[in-house]
Amino acid sequence: MGRIVLVVVIAAAWLLGSCTTAMPPPPPPAGRPAVIENSVGMSMVLVPAGSFRMGSDEPIERLAADFPRYEPERLRSIDDEAPVHEVRITRAFYLGRHEVTVGQFARFLAESGYVPESVADGTGGYGFNPAYDPSLTPRRDAFEGRNPAYSWRNPGFAQGDDHPVLNITWNDAQAMARWLSIREGRRYRLPTEAEWEYACRAGNRTRYQGGDHPSVLLRTANTFDRDSARHWPKWRDDASPGADGHPFTAPVGSFAPNAWGLHDMHGNAWEWVADWYAADYYSRSPVNDPTGPLAGDVRVRRGGSWHSWPFYLRASFRNWNTPQTRYTLVGMRLLLESEP
């Protein structure tokens, strides 16, 4: 019993020591509302122009101490988060308060006639199947696929219209942004990687909104926790602390927003961003409004998902896939450019 109490006390001290005071949302620029609702019911939050320090320079030794289950080689592989560098976002923009939902994506398909790639190419997507054994497959992937049984309609578990849409490709996300742009006569797009991290941090330098310790995720993010671990017992020791009642996706907005009013910037669904990926891009990134490499093979996704462990939910963590990838963890959040 004494050991349990000591662990709790240490964790609490760590949490309190790692928290910083969140920056309050700045007043909106003159003439621009702080929040707008678009023609398909998306709530868009005005993100101000400003500067921030992008990336992470945490020493490997600290990461190894804080995430002891991760192999040193895995920790060394995140050198793409460095160097920490100054970024200036020169124009305010509107960003979706929530990830794009199943219902919003369904409306896009119904009104545009667009066919998502998981359906158009006949190969489907990925999904959860309790009878599927990852150890029997060459990739040892946690999910079954590709399989035509899975798509944005069916990730292998029940979703309501208010859950984040999954199994969409980067190209699908681009198509929805183009459709909305034509429909409303103003430009929608995916955020750049820099815009995404700027909005995620909302003025903070901590790993997660609210602090550095994974315990803060319980109220702010839908992650791989004890509820999810019931379906993947071999990964129970990697789960986030606690249980949030959502073993799979949660309705968007179920968890506390960050300081600028954005929900699910950590967890629920990985979010495609606009940039091509390059491991060394931060060493040559311009200060003003970086947009990533001019070309590449894979596009960046950010934020982690309902199936992510705390290490991968950090604000600085970068991941990537080909633009044609569709997966039961990956969705999107759209940006609306604000008029000057």
Cite the ranges covered by each PLM segment.
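Short, compositionally biased
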Residues: G2-F143, W170-N171, R178, N204, ...
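Functional-site microenvironments in short loops/helix caps that host divalent-cation chemistry
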Residues: R53, E58-R62, D66-S77, V115, ...
